[in-house]
Amino acid sequence: MAAVSLRLGDLVWGKLGRYPPWPGKIVNPPKDLKKPRGKKCFFVKFFGTEDHAWIKVEQLKPYHAHKEEMIKINKGKRFQQAVDAVEEFLRRAKGKDQTSSHSSADDKNRRNSSEERSRPISGDEKRKLSLSEGKVKKNMGEGKKRVPSGSSERGSKSPLKRAQEQSPRKRGRPPKDEKDLSIPESSTVKGMMAGPMATFKWQPNVSEPVKDADPHFHHFLLSQTEKPAVCYQAITKKLKICEEETGSTSIQAADSTAVNGSVTPTDKKIGFLGLGLMGSGIVSNLLKMGHTVTVWNRTAEKCDLFIQEGARLGRTPAEVVSTCDITFACVSDPKAAKDLVLGPSGVLQGIRPGKCYVDMSTVDADTVTELAQVIVSRGGRFLEAPVSGNQQLSNDGMLVILAAGDRGLYEDCSSCFQAMGKTSFFLGEVGNAAKMMLIVNMVQGSFMATIAEGLTLAQVTGQSQQTLLDILNQGQLASIFLDQKCQNILQGNFKPDFYLKYIQKDLRLAIALGDAVNHPTPMAAAANEVYKRAKALDQSDNDMSAVYRAYIH
């Protein structure tokens, strides 16, 4: 591949890892962000996603030269929105250039005039100038009366413009904050960098740490610069992260990837077991993105809708696994997860060398480790991938996926994770994702109980619950979760988006996780008791927000 000449401000197509090429712009990195060692790379901000990353030069292509090619390959909605953002950026930049063309012409005229004044004047010209001198002085006097002070040529320029003219940059020398890039700024891009879309340019506040600029951006950068070296060996060794060169086995930063752009479906056959609240949305998105999917559910009627959408029907879990390359499973609890694998006509009976199994259930680390061992012992490959989200996020394909286990299988699931989620995290050895998922749900469940407690306390003290919600929505606690759950309570709508019985199960497992390492979890324990009371009030199959009823009965 021929070398491509790129400069700061150039529009490019950037290829990041396993994701499709995405439109972006080469920008200056934050001053305290070190450039990765090794091959030459540029810092790129992607349109439509707010993601940033160092991209190797061989993974970059000029935007205009490859535009038609990329548009033919990718057809997704988010990809098209990103392309539209680029075109809007170009339109506004062009309009800015046209607006400034007149001032550029004036500058040129002034330079020409200056050159005329600086050349030697002949005798004839001196006589002509002396004859017209009186008229010139008169006109200048009239001009002073008409033109307000401050509108002179010097006064019409901004302080920044004057500073730039007084301190011109030496040719070929990049500004101080561009030294890491070692590239000159393209003259054709200067207008774009100052145009109406200036918000697209990376502009860190020097008085604030970079991580405050974009929470996801900070984690994304960590994932690009601090990835631990990982490898896998057979059976149990295959499921462990190898020690880094320093000898430390701790994971400094999870390997995460922002899922964006259109999805190019894998040619592998996909199986899916379990069509509950979460599984149904996941399968629907897999089918929409063009995957070949075989489904199974304990109650076969739930499969009918997906058969109409193009899915195939599997009669047993073993049949699905044996006929598919990668099989996902999403069931309710540890017992259901074990029964699915170890029971009659279960997953284990269909496992052969090379078959892949991905468990998306929220279970404890011991359960998922046991499942991994039996799958790998049959020559299969295993990945745990519980998801953070609810029914609506599942339907929208906006789940957060926490994966651990076989790194190669994680890569093979790329298009599937793109279809079902907005972000995926790789957390290392089997059991890490289960632990992280329980901690996430422990925080969520405890917060939900606190919300319910606050609303009931407001009610019994004569305060408006709606006003409390309005105040919370204007403060630091404001979130979609807070607003939706409070609205559910105020409207008395407890249609399940996340079953109360499942959040209580996760709290119980999180408390057990704390007990196993002798770590106190008093807040989770208190919340768990409230959920147990709500279950006793027959709220198990309602949404988790129904914990509110435990406080009013």
UniProtKB/Swiss-Prot annotation:
Q: Which Gene3D superfamilies match?
A: 2.30.30.140, N-(1-d-carboxylethyl)-l-norvaline Dehydrogenase, domain 2 (1.10.1040.10), NAD(P)-binding Rossmann-like Domain (3.40.50.720)
Q: List the disulfide bonds.
A: none
Q: Which residues bind NAD(+)?
A: 271-285, 362, 505
Q: Which GO terms describe its biological process?
A: transcription elongation-coupled chromatin remodeling; transcription initiation-coupled chromatin remodeling
UniProt DNA-binding residue ranges = 168-180
For the modification Phosphoserine, which residues carry it? 130, 167, 540
Q: Residue ranges of region Disordered?
A: 92-190
Site of covalent link Glycyl lysine isopeptide (Lys-Gly) (interchain with G-Cter in SUMO2) = 135, 176, 179, 201, 211, 227, 237, 240, 269, 302
Q: Where is this site: Required to promote KDM1B demethylase activity toward histone H3K4me1 and H3K4me2?
A: 217
| GO cellular component terms given for this protein | chromatin; cytosol; nucleoplasm; nucleosome
Q: Where would you find this protein in the cell?
A: Nucleus; Chromosome
Question: Which InterPro entries does the annotation name?
Answer: 6-PGluconate_DH-like_C_sf, 6PGD_dom2, 6PGDH_NADP-bd, GLYR1_PWWP, HIBADH-like_NADP-bd, HIBADH-related_NP60_sf, NAD(P)-bd_dom_sf, PWWP_dom
Q: Which intervals hold domain PWWP?
A: 8-66
Pfam families linked to this entry: NAD_binding_11 (PF14833), NAD_binding_2 (PF03446), PWWP (PF00855)
Q: Which GO terms describe its molecular function?
A: chromatin-protein adaptor activity; DNA binding; histone binding; NAD binding; NADP binding; nucleosome binding
Q: Which UniProt keywords apply?
A: Chromosome, DNA-binding, Isopeptide bond, Nucleus, Phosphoprotein, Ubl conjugation
**Where in the sequence is the signal peptide annotated?**
none
Major localisation: nucleus
Question: Would you identify the family this protein belongs to, as annotated?
Answer: Belongs to the HIBADH-related family. NP60 subfamily.
Note the subunit structure: Homotetramere. Interacts with MAPK14. Interacts with KDM1B at nucleosomes; this interaction stimulates H3K4me1 and H3K4me2 demethylation. Binds to mononucleosomes. Interacts with GATA4; the interaction is required for a synergistic activation of GATA4 target genes transcription.
Domain comment text? Answer: The A.T hook DNA-binding domain is required for the interaction with MAPK14.
Protein name per Swiss-Prot or TrEMBL: Cytokine-like nuclear factor N-PAC
Species assigned in the record:
Bos taurus
* Gene name of the record: GLYR1
